[in-house]
Design a protein with these regions (language model features):
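Auxiliary tRNA-acceptor-end handling modules of aminoacyl-tRNA synthetases
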Residues: 1-271, 289, 293, 298, ...
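Alpha-helix N-cap/helix-initiation motif
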Residues: 272-276
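Solvent-exposed, polar/charged alpha-helical surfaces in well-ordered, non-transmembrane soluble domains
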Residues: 277-284, 288
Length: 356
């Protein structure tokens, strides 16, 4: 096999959760280390830019998919496998074997190992030049409605690659033919720019809280096959922020303490200036509720940094919670979030605020 230095010659290297190599021709390599094999990762896909009149509740910032994945070495290949924690059992329980056998995880992609000098080097160009399994860039219903063809690679590209300590970000543009495109589109073409965040889930999973029907939680559904109920036992975990007292002794004395990690919402740079003070006030008004739970300054509103202040900041980055301001005739607002499928811990949230 070729030497690593020869394969990645003249490519831009970026170290982080998954080291990457990328060049101007659009070739992209991942370097998968032994330490990341088998580790739970969350892949979150979002629109960065979408065509006009595509779908009433789809906009820049909308999530197209959220999937738990891990990398597995199989011979001379690295497989990307989708994982699920929906059906569970104690590993020491005999029924655990049946749970595994009846919940076989799908293989999303398989990559040849081209070099193993400093980890397993795999080319992922084709994977990110397609609407690959799990991306769900265009739902099947809309593909049928707009009579869309496959991805035209000549009019598609990988636009941005960035890797950070706990996440790796890939942005690409995918272009499709569409013989029955949305109104106002005479080109019979639809192009989408999509960002994929691959983020490391917490190594110390948050303690779970079970859903209480008396409280309006968003929740995760699971089925426990090790239950004493003598049947498959369905239950739900509350999706919640991980607020932990920075001073536990003071917290136990009933004093207000700041959390170790406050909830931070960034305002979309597209938010009209005249509304921004009220957006910030509306967000931070929730602090009075958190004070009842013993926390002060638990939730903070900030303006998103400018490119000059932080060139790496991206609204689509799954590390950051955003209030997205959307130029749309749609009314009202929505509040989707991304959570750890193991525990329900909210990783980030994007409030979609429509102009109407």
């Amino acid at each position: 096999p070729k030497a690593l230095s020869e394969i990645v010659k003249d490519m831009t290297a970026d170290q982080g959760l998954i080291p990457t190599f990328f060049n101007e021709k659009g070739t992209l390599y991942f370097q998968i280390s032994d330490s990341i094999l088998g580790r739970d990762l969350l892949m979150v896909s979002r629109y960065v830019q979408i065509p006009a009149n595509f779908n009433a509740y789809s906009n820049a910032g909308s999530k197209t998919s959220e999937q738990l994945v891990h990398f597995v070495k199989k011979g001379n290949k690295i497989q990307l496998i989708q994982k699920s924690y929906s059906n569970v059992a104690e590993q020491t329980d005999p029924i655990y074997l049946s749970v595994v056998q009846n919940n076989f995880d799908p293989i999303l992609a398989s990559f040849e190992i081209e070099n193993s000098e400093q980890g397993y080097l795999i080319e992922v160009t084709d994977y990110f030049m397609n609407d690959s399994p799990g991306f769900n860039v265009v739902p099947s219903r809309l593909k049928t409605q707009y009579k869309m063809g496959g991805v035209d690679k000549k009019r598609s590209a990988i636009d941005r690659v960035a890797s950070f300590p706990i996440n790796t970000e890939i942005t690409h543009t995918l272009t499709y033919s569409a013989s029955k495109a949305p109104r106002g589109n005479n080109a019979e073409t639809l192009s989408f720019q999509v960002n994929h965040s691959i983020i490391e889930l917490p190594r110390d999973p948050m303690p779970v809280r079970y859903e209480d029907k008396r409280v309006g939680w968003f929740s995760l559904g699971k089925i426990n096959y090790s239950s004493q109920a003598l049947k498959s036992d369905a239950y739900r975990l509350a999706r919640r922020w991980r607020l932990e007292p920075s001073d536990m002794e003071a917290y136990k004395r009933g004093e207000l303490v700041p959390p170790v990690k406050p909830i931070v919402y960034y305002l979309d740079p597209a938010t009209p200036l005249k509304w921004r003070p009220y957006f910030r006030k509306g967000i931070e008004d929730w602090n009075s509720a958190f004070e009842k739970a013993g926390f002060k300054n638990a939730i903070i509103a900030k303006d998103a940094p400018t490119p000059e202040e932080d060139p790496d900041f991206s609204p689509e980055d799954a590390r950051f919670s955003m209030v997205r301001y959307v130029a749309s005739t749609t009314r009202n607002a929505t509040g989707p979030s991304v959570s750890d499928p193991r525990t329900g811990e909210i990783i980030e949230s994007d409030i979609i605020w429509y102009h109407n």
